[in-house]
């Protein structure tokens, strides 16, 4: 029988593996990191961040990790800091590097699970700043199911040019305006030099802020934390408090599976609809739900789309940035408003150990007279802005974001491209005319590989004044900064022989947000003929993208990498 030479601590559920006499060699290495007899008696709490110097979203996160460690120490546990990767979407956008963006979500999840599991931590805090950091962290948190909290690095402050707030999307759209002759190269350079004034995630209701909000709503980050700006005193305080709070979770025996219930995901979808969040929320919430063993489907999003109005006048389709929401009460004030009106489940438990309703009691209502959140009686849109479409072009579904779009349906000729680069060249060469349906395919999860975003392309179309006149369809994704008549996540994707693979330039296509249909007007006989004539390209086969292409699921299932439906050959 092994002799424990470290005193018993009922919070050391996992790190107690180091306590016995035969683990003396393990402790010898840990002593070299600063651990002592005293610290061996404490639970070990990991603090893992996606710090990197290459992007404002993450450049400040190493320091935030140090702050979180202080909170862990203050609560009586032993903190250990780790790092994992990030891919900056705004920097990778429109380049071959964009194929690594969604791929990085699952690498982040796997690396967190490997590091936390490999070192037997009792609990952990995950700190993220850019788009895929949030769902990557949450997939790991759900899979590990040990006490954990996510802490968001915070939103960037808006840039300012000539007295007007601007952000990164202003620069992307500036390229379209420059190409159209509405802006000079010098004016675009002025946008470039003033759009990003410091650290923080992209400033509108884009993917980073959408997912940070969703995680707070679900109860896996501290109340109010998602809307605290990156450079605010409140942000530093909530990062430190996250360290203390995760130790409290450990004391209470509170696990992610207690928090990540079906009702938690319903509330996340509700607030995403009300705030006009990113299309990527569908993909990421499906993936997190899969990790949490919660039954969630694309069809569920339409259920909430039909009954939750769009209230927030936030970018990309509105005029305000996320910091403006913070200034009028932040996410808790929005949640209080929705809870009072029967849209949320107030009795759910959260990472504080309190219910949603109990947490919200500590926060003020929306600032009287504010303009960021519109009243339920006069919403920005009567229903939600994220719509799941189905039809013979997308039998498994597709995701449309229709906030700010005046046109409710369009039927037009397809202009089909097998890469974003070719589509961009066509836009810049004025080959795309009003009424066209631009289609970019073979860029899905397997085909990209990595399901790249099309912000460069969509922003150019908007910048040229065609945002309401040209539809853009893809089996890839759109940035949270995208708006206009756009449909992404078309499934099945072209790479696996989805109908989009057989669409040809000139075919008529209908997108209808009222009937939630997406249709290619091609007779079945002609479609069968095209299938017989078409040879699909081989899957990418090298390196991490090759691995990803071979194991990733359909976008309709969240593009997850641990969903297998094995046949007799053992092939996925």
UniProtKB/Swiss-Prot annotation:
Matching entries from InterPro entries are given as: DHAD_IlvD/Edd, Dihydro-acid_dehy_C, DihydroxyA_deHydtase, DiOHA_6PGluconate_deHydtase_CS, ILV_EDD_C, ILV_EDD_N, IlvD/EDD_N
Q: Name one Pfam family in it.
A: ILVD_EDD_N
Asked whether the keyword Iron is assigned, the reply is yes
Where are residues bearing N6-carboxylysine located in the sequence? 132
Keywords on this record?
2Fe-2S, Amino-acid biosynthesis, Branched-chain amino acid biosynthesis, Iron, Iron-sulfur, Lyase, Magnesium, Metal-binding
Which co-factors does it depend on?
Answer: [2Fe-2S] cluster; Mg(2+)
UniProt record similarity statement: Belongs to the IlvD/Edd family.
For this entry, the protein name equals Dihydroxy-acid dehydratase
Task: Please name the source species.
Answer: Streptococcus thermophilus (strain ATCC BAA-250 / LMG 18311)
């Amino acid at each position: 029988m092994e002799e424990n030479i470290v005193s018993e601590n009922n919070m050391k559920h996992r790190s107690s593996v180091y306590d016995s006499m035969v683990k003396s060699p393990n402790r010898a290495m840990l002593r070299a990191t600063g651990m002592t007899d005293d610290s061996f008696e404490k639970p070990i709490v990991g603090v893992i961040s996606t710090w990197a110097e290459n992007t404002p979203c993450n450049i400040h996160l190493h320091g935030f990790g140090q702050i979180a460690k202080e909170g862990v120490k203050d609560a009586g546990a032993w903190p250990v800091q780790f790092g994992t990767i990030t891919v900056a979407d705004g920097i990778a956008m429109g380049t071959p590097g964009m194929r690594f963006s969604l791929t990085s979500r699952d690498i982040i999840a796997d690396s967190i699970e490997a590091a936390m599991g490999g070192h037997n931590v009792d609990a952990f805090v995950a700190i993220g700043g850019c788009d895929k950091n949030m769902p990557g962290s949450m997939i790991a948190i759900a899979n590990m199911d040990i006490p954990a909290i996510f802490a968001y690095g915070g939103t960037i402050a808006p840039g300012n040019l000539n007295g007007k707030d601007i952000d990164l999307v202003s620069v992307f759209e500036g390229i379209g305006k420059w190409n159209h002759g509405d802006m000079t190269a010098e004016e675009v350079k002025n946008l470039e030099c003033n759009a990003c004034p410091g650290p923080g995630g992209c400033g509108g209701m884009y993917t980073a802020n959408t997912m940070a909000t969703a995680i707070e709503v679900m109860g896996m980050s501290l109340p109010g934390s998602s809307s605290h700006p990156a450079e605010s005193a409140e942000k530093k305080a909530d990062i430190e408090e996250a360290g203390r709070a995760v130790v409290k979770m450990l004391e209470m025996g509170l696990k992610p599976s207690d928090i990540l219930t079906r009702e938690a995901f319903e509330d996340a979808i509700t607030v995403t609809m009300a705030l006009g969040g990113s299309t990527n929320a569908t993909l990421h919430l499906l993936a997190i739900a899969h990790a949490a063993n919660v039954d969630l489907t694309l069809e569920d999003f339409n259920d909430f789309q039909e009954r939750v109005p769009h209230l927030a006048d936030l970018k990309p389709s509105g005029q305000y940035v996320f910091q403006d929401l913070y200034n009028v009460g932040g996410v808790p004030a929005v949640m209080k408003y929705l809870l009072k009106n029967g849209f949320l489940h107030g009795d759910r438990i959260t990472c504080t150990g309190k219910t949603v309703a109990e947490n919200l009691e500590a926060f003020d209502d929306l600032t009287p007279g504010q303009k960021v959140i519109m009243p339920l009686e006069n919403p920005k849109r009567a229903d939600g802005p994220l719509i799941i479409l189905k039809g013979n072009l997308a039998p498994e579904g597709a995701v449309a974001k229709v906030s700010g779009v005046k046109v409710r349906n369009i039927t037009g000729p397809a202009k089909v491209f097998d890469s974003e680069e070719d589509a961009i060249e066509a836009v810049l060469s004025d080959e795309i005319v009003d009424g066209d349906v631009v289609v970019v395919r073979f860029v899905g999860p397997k085909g990209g590989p990595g399901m790249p975003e099309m912000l460069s392309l969509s922003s150019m179309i908007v910048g040229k004044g065609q945002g309401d006149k040209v539809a853009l369809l893809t089996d890839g994704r759109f940035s949270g900064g995208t708006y206009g008549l756009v449909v992404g996540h078309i499934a099945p994707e072209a790479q696996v022989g989805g109908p989009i693979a057989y669409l040809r330039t000139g075919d008529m296509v209908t997108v209808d947000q009222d009937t939630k249909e997406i249709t290619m007007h091609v007779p079945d006989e002609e479609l069968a003929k095209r299938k017989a004539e078409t040879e699909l390209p081989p899957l990418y086969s090298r390196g991490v993208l090759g691995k990803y292409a071979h194991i990733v699921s359909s976008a309709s299932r969240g593009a997850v990498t641990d969903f297998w439906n094995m046949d007799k050959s053992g092939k996925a």
